[in-house]
Amino acid sequence: MGSAQARQRLLAIFGQVQAYIFQVEMLKRCDPLALLPLVGSLKLNALTIRMLRRKLGGALIEQAQHQQTPLACALTMALEYAEVEGERVLRAVDDVNLAGPEGFFRATMRLDEPCEYHVRVHLDTYGGPIDAEVQFLHDAENFLKQLNYCHLITGFEAGLDALESVARFLTRTVGSGIVVPPELCDPTHPCSVCFEELCVTANQGEAVHRRLLECTCDHITRQMAVRVANIDIARHLPHALSVASERRAAAEAALRALEARRVQGHNGKSAGTEDPTQQVASRLLESHHVFKPASRCLYAVSELKFWLASTKHGDMGQPRAIDTFTENLETLDKQEKFFHLQAATVELALFGRTLDHFDRLFADQLLGLDVIDGMLVGSCAVSPDDHIEALIKACYTHHMSAPLLQRLTDPDTSNREALKQLLGRIGVDTDDGAGELGDALDVDLDNLGGAPPVNSTPCGEDALCRTVSEERPWDKLLERATADASQRRRMYAERLSKRSIASLGRCVREQRRELEKTLRVNVYGEVLLHTYVSSYNGFCARRGFCAAVSRAGTIIDNRSSTSAFDSHQFMKAALLRHPIDQSLMPSITHKFFELINGPVFDNAGHNFAQPPNTALYYSVENVGLLPHLKEELARFMITAAKGDWSISEFQRFYCFEGVTGVTATQRLAWKYIGELILAAAVFSSVFHCGEVRLLRADRTYPDSSGAQRCVSGIYITYEASCPLVAVLSAAPHGAIGAETVVIYDSDVFSLLYAVLQQLAPGSGAN
């Protein structure tokens, strides 16, 4: 079976296991008495999970010993979680007669146990032990990035032990299905992908770290838009084939009756909420027909109705933000109550009783939550997007409660006031209610359209067609000044109001992204799992390399050989007397960046490869390395090449005795690696034996049989017990065989001397 077919089968199994986990999580929240008839199926599923673990567990463990893949890792975690939680539900169902429904929920959801998401992580570095606690998803990612930065001062055994603790945390989180508990995720903490995205997008002059403060991470967890419709129960009820058709028909009839009552009440309420002024104007206009002459006032009423209607229906393409958020918290509360009423009605019709689900049994505790906690918990009747729209609606409503803002944002206000004043001038009282509108409509519209009497003003003419007198006597000066001041004050207030509304809209747009990320349903992304697998494979490759070179045909161990001192002295004297070619400094610096970078950021190995300094930049920036250390790291090789770059004593290369602290140990490791790179560069130029390939042990990979592929070269293993290994005469594709020569050493110069001897004519090495 090829790798593609194996991957397809693993994906199919993984999908079924995920579906089973989702069902188990649903059963944890259902009435336990409803699970009693399903015990046989639950046991069969639990046995199937056990069979899968027994059948696939050995192969998955064997693969994990060599190299892990995200799919295999996710399947391993999902199988472990499914077995534990599925059998937990079975045990709780068996004890439900004694513990009751509340005891069932407490057992399945671990309500009386300490938080399962607190995991202690211990890491032994060459500079001392490190203890950390992982309790959030970003804590796990931060620790993996820190371990990636400190990989060169951490042995593979210590690294794998620390990753084992992280794996336990990931099993309880990433392995628990697709939905993320809201208490695990904090979207304000950016991940490595967030940083990389900001590095390749336009920054408009802002620093990356400043932009990170406004970043909302959607990579470790991804938000999903979930919509809940009122007709979901009625839509799925006909497909409930496990109940009798008569009961199902009764439930459908009860739902239709509930919906009819709700629609009738809604229509009655809507009919009574029309503005009285609008009612009077509508009935006044309806009493007119084309055989009657239209007065000037009647035409004005019609024109105002036209403008009110046009503003309501005109701009349909781009509705205002205030008009799009039509729901509020009270409406959502009514919607949720109606949903629960529907559910209870259907349950009574189908089963003859209401079910004791988790949210009903613990309703008193849920009611004690405040508004924010209640929205985080969510509801099965209201989608998160409805809550978000209600919050934004409430924000707009509170901000626009000022009369001036209402007049500015609602241009119909002036039209409605003008319509009310006009109706008052023609003798129609809009405050008496709909019961007295009949008398108000007995208006002689013909007289309203006739000529005005002598020495009188036409009806409403001073309000609609006001003219400005040409005479401006001095006694009106104070009145005009007051009017001008009022006009300027009104224009200034409108300008401030427009600016206020623009600021509010900008704030809502900026905060909506974070609000959606917080309240929407989140599922696990692939970033955290990929980061864990990359870090695990790096330490696992170092372990596999050490095991592979131990099977070589010829092994020369100079780590404790006293006879190698002369070789050390000869090679050191030969190399130190020659200066370093400055034209090689760019390549030497890049080699330094390549060897100190961790296994997680391997941008140099991508299809569109980037230079090693880019990957190292991501590595140090993601751990928040201090600026002075970044400057020291950037100029490290240039500074080392100008001075005495040989720092290690005989057989004490990569020795950290007497050094404590991560920073001091890290700096010493940089010096050791710089010494190795400079010695190899001078060695190649002095002895003209070609380029000496400096390789990393964690960049070796196993083949299909599990054997580690190690091409010829000098490897740095980052292990204090055996830091340097030379592999010579490796078989094609890097296979270690009987013809391979392996040299162990803990001294750079004696290792180069041994390599020179092996490369001499007649040795047969290459």
UniProtKB/Swiss-Prot annotation:
Function: Component of the molecular motor that translocates viral genomic DNA in empty capsid during DNA packaging. Forms a tripartite terminase complex together with TRM2 and TRM3 in the host cytoplasm. Once the complex reaches the host nucleus, it interacts with the capsid portal vertex. This portal forms a ring in which genomic DNA is translocated into the capsid. TRM1 carries an endonuclease activity that plays an important role for the cleavage of concatemeric viral DNA into unit length genomes.
Zinc fingers (C3H1-type) by residue: 191-219
GO cellular component annotations of the record: host cell nucleus
Subcellular location: Host nucleus
Keywords: ATP-binding, Host nucleus, Late protein, Metal-binding, Nucleotide-binding, Viral genome packaging, Viral release from host cell, Zinc, Zinc-finger
One annotated GO biological process: viral DNA genome packaging
Pfam families in UniProt: PRTP
Subunit structure: Associates with TRM2 and TRM3 to form the tripartite terminase complex. Interacts with portal protein.
Family named by the database record: Belongs to the herpesviridae TRM1 protein family.
Gene Ontology molecular function terms on file: ATP binding; zinc ion binding
Any coiled-coil regions, as ranges: none
Protein name according to UniProt: Tripartite terminase subunit 1
Signal peptide feature range: none
Binding annotation for ATP: 683-690
Highest taxon of source: Viruses
